[in-house]
Amino acid sequence: MKTKAVLMLMLLVLVAATLVQGEPEPSYVGDCGSNGGSCVSSYCPYGNRLNYFCPLGRTCCRRSYG
């Protein structure tokens, strides 16, 4: 019975570690750089703005701009 409890505990720790780790750094599906843009901290004209993820609250802009 004790062995079963130890195995269950180990399994629980493994599952918890996996959940805490979560997915790898922001999913690159919606990443700005991977989709032909670059993250800018300055103003980006509305026509050049892309709706992709940028860290630190930056705006995703088309690479052709600036």
Curated annotation (Swiss-Prot):
Belongs to the beta-defensin family. GO terms for biological process: defense response to bacterium. The keyword Nucleotidyltransferase does not apply. Residues 23-26 form a propeptide. Keywords: Amidation, Antibiotic, Antimicrobial, Defensin, Disulfide bond, Signal. Forms dimers and higher-order oligomers. It comes from Panulirus argus (Caribbean spiny lobster). Disulfide bonds join C32-C54, C39-C61, C44-C60. Residues 1-22 form the signal peptide. This is Panusin. Antimicrobial peptide. Has antibacterial activity against Gram-positive bacteria S.aureus ATCC 29737 and B.subtilis ATCC 6633 as well as against Gram-negative bacteria E.coli ATCC 10536 and K.pneumoniae ATCC 10031. It comes from the Eukaryota. The modification Tyrosine amide is found at Y65.
